[in-house]
Curated annotation (Swiss-Prot):
Start-end of Basic residues biased regions: 1-16
Gene3D superfamilies: Ribosomal protein L10e/L16
NCBIfam families given in the database record: rplP_bact
PANTHER family (alphabetical): 50S/60S RIBOSOMAL PROTEIN L16, LARGE RIBOSOMAL SUBUNIT PROTEIN UL16M
CDD domains in UniProt: Ribosomal_L16_L10e
Region (Disordered) location: 1-23
Official protein name in the record: Large ribosomal subunit protein uL16
Amino acid sequence: MLIPKRVKYRRQHRPTRSGVSKGGNRINFGDYAIQALEPAYITNRQIEAARIAINRHVKRGGKVWINIFPDRPLTQKPLGVRMGSGKGPVEKWVANVKPGRILFEMTYPNEATAIEALRRAGQKLPCKVRIIKKEDQF
């Protein structure tokens, strides 16, 4: 699972989901990529599920890059606990994703197989995504 090794502060304020991605919206490493079309919190489990979906479909011969990291903690109080008495424990780690952000990149010799693998990975994510190619970028 993807979680930070150590953090300066264990609990943080909830990150904002408004606006568009300022950086990380170009393909740098691979030939194909998944791009987010709406804001979302993507958990470490969802990132891992998408990565496994890609690897199971392509098997060998390609390379996958994960461009997001779940570095923000989300806290939640246990069920049946009254209001007050401090902030709850960390429930999960999320990556704050804004529209336009490249989530995964990959390279693979066969285009149809690569696009199908990214489509399967996109179904594991909680936001609308699109698949883009490196040559389609402006």
